[in-house]
Amino acid sequence: MKILVINGPNLNLLGNREPETYGRTTLATIEAELRRQASQAGVEIEFFQSNHEGALIDCLHAARGRVDAAVINPGALGHYSIALRDALAAVDYPAVEVHLSNIYRREEFRHHTVTAAVVAGQISGFGPLSYRLGLEAAIELARRRREAPPDGGSNG
């Protein structure tokens, strides 16, 4: 089983950018924790980060037929990128959307994500724990899909 973890714009600056909102944990630290979690679960994990919408879409497309599920933090793109939303809708694997901050306790424009309607679920507001919970959910979704009957059982 393989899980893809995708991070969007500005997440490469975690630990330095707005620490009062996003905390001081770096993306490298989050990735190391997810590697440990995946290893303990016997799951392969792959990471990708880009500040460019097209690169994120290309990554989602390239993962078709290669991964069993994804965890995505689209960053600000989640609020307005119809192209990213459509890419998530087009892939053949479930995705879990995560956000470090509670987007519903922030500015009004952050209360809605266009991507939420096409992912299996959304986790926000738990800091780095959002990623660990997202990975746990992605693993469970992938397991359910593998165990589903071939005649159209639910994929999560």
UniProtKB/Swiss-Prot annotation:
The active site is at Y22 (proton acceptor), H99 (proton donor). CDD domains: DHQase_II. It catalyses: 3-dehydroquinate = 3-dehydroshikimate + H2O. The keyword Lyase applies. PANTHER family: CATABOLIC 3-DEHYDROQUINASE (PTHR21272:SF3). The gene is aroQ. It comes from Moorella thermoacetica (strain ATCC 39073 / JCM 9320). This is 3-dehydroquinate dehydratase. The record marks R17 as: Transition state stabilizer. Gene3D superfamilies: Dehydroquinase, class II. Keywords: Amino-acid biosynthesis, Aromatic amino acid biosynthesis, Lyase.
